[in-house]
Amino acid sequence: MNMAKDIKFSADARAAMVRGVDMLADTVKVTLGPKGRNVVLEKAFGSPLITNDGVTIAKEIELEDHFENMGAKLVSEVASKTNDIAGDGTTTATVLTQAIVHEGLKNVTAGANPIGIRRGIETATATAVEALKAIAQPVSGKEAIAQVAAVSSRSEKVGEYISEAMERVGNDGVITIEESRGMETELEVVEGMQFDRGYLSQYMVTDNEKMVADLENPFILITDKKVSNIQDILPLLEEVLKTNRPLLIIADDVDGEALPTLVLNKIRGTFNVVAVKAPGFGDRRKAMLEDIAILTGGAVITEDLGLELKDATMTALGQAAKITVDKDSTVIVEGSGSSEAIANRIALIKSQLETTTSDFDREKLQERLAKLAGGVAVIKVGAPTETALKEMKLRIEDALNATRAAVEEGIVAGGGTALITVIEKVAALELEGDDATGRNIVLRALEEPVRQIALNAGYEGSVVIDKLKNSPAGTGFNAATGEWVDMIKTGIIDPVKVTRSALQNAASVASLILTTEAVVANKPEPAAPAPAMPAGMDPGMMGGF
């Protein structure tokens, strides 16, 4: 049965959504900058989480009013998308969204055409992004990488760990962040590999908040066959069940009745199982499965060797210390394969590299070599309390993402300074009518991050912006000390990818809100009446329990 709906139109619809935008943005923006404050989040279980991570806060906010909640959810989407693309900049994106929505709403309410405004916003945003790319400086070398990581995590020590990890496993190498048993944070490089295949069903996750499946000390079934009939793997499942250890299935596919059966057993808690598709295609898939088997000390169950799934025994299963699976990738840490077998496999790939004449094959062989020989860097986070540990872990995850983004697209002056620098280019756009209004909205929004950073540090935003506009290029306001400095030399930097993604996502969602003419929400259902008391029962009797 369909629920009854509440519908609001034009100004009413937009006003309700903007109330939601404001509630979320006002909560998140207090965390912006070096003097940003913390937000305390109540948790259903355990102690509250204290954080200044924008996306973590945004995901927690759920409003009672359906219309307001839709506005809040749209801004939360901006934060999440920016986090997915660049790994940081979620608070900046939230502040920019709120600024564009507010400025835009004033003009729409005054009678401007929302479609014209949207066009102007899109043109101005594209110009600002190009201008950001033009002033970007490349990041290379261990020291520069450490500096970027230290700024994002607010800790020089963390900066050193991240640059060290990236040096040892490569910029695209696998770096995982785990909780340490001690008080100290430390870096360790272990044998491991990552491939680009995620879980086949989201019901297989073990951490619903992060939507990942963590398998400790698992067995690994590796096959190039399709698993459609659960009977084929039932004998193996029963053997694994006796050990009380989790299982990862890497197969050509898991479908038919096999997938729902596995999911059902996972949900019931019978056993912990995750299924993923095998990586690669054709002959390369066979080679990659063989790599995984050698790394984990297992065997590939394949028709090429005349092996059948139903005849497989526990000896064919690989093992590892830990496996993490998210929606897009699988990371195997410390496989149980023998060092000698792994070394032989690496030597084989190297000899193939020397003899191949195809550039494509060479690239794929190098990829396999990096996966086998590169290992996985593990940053083990230590802290005195569980609350501090969670906060530190979030900070390091942000820093790692920001550092990768910096290496990819370069850096610009931080603290919102780069957004002020590109104002000149955006202002030079020759637009007319509502398009020009859209451009002016973006011009005003570009000032907002600096204004908020100054405000959080106890300074007057307008004064700081005014002085910044009249300062030499590259000079900015260090909110931590209250001084005017050369931002990049001082190490106050932002990855271009972070700043660019924040602006693009904010402009996109804010434009959608401004062009909204109707909002449809579910009507809250009336509370069910309390069941009637059986006849002859004295209400006073209830007090005895």
Swiss-Prot record:
Forms a cylinder of 14 subunits composed of two heptameric rings stacked back-to-back. Interacts with the co-chaperonin GroES. Keywords: ATP-binding, Chaperone, Cytoplasm, Isomerase, Nucleotide-binding. Pfam families: Cpn60_TCP1. It catalyses: ATP + H2O + a folded polypeptide = ADP + phosphate + an unfolded polypeptide. This is Chaperonin GroEL. Together with its co-chaperonin GroES, plays an essential role in assisting protein folding. The GroEL-GroES system forms a nano-cage that allows encapsulation of the non-native substrate proteins and provides a physical environment optimized to promote and accelerate protein folding. CDD domains: GroEL. ATP binds at T31, L32, G33, P34, D88, G89, T90, T91, T92, G415, N478, A479, A480, D494. Its EC number is 5.6.1.7. Its main location: cytoplasm. One of its GO terms (molecular function) is ATP-dependent protein folding chaperone. GO terms for biological process: protein refolding. It is an enzyme of class 5 (isomerase). Belongs to the chaperonin (HSP60) family. The gene is groEL. GO terms for cellular component: cytoplasm. PROSITE patterns: CHAPERONINS_CPN60. It is found in: Cytoplasm. It comes from Streptococcus pyogenes serotype M2 (strain MGAS10270).
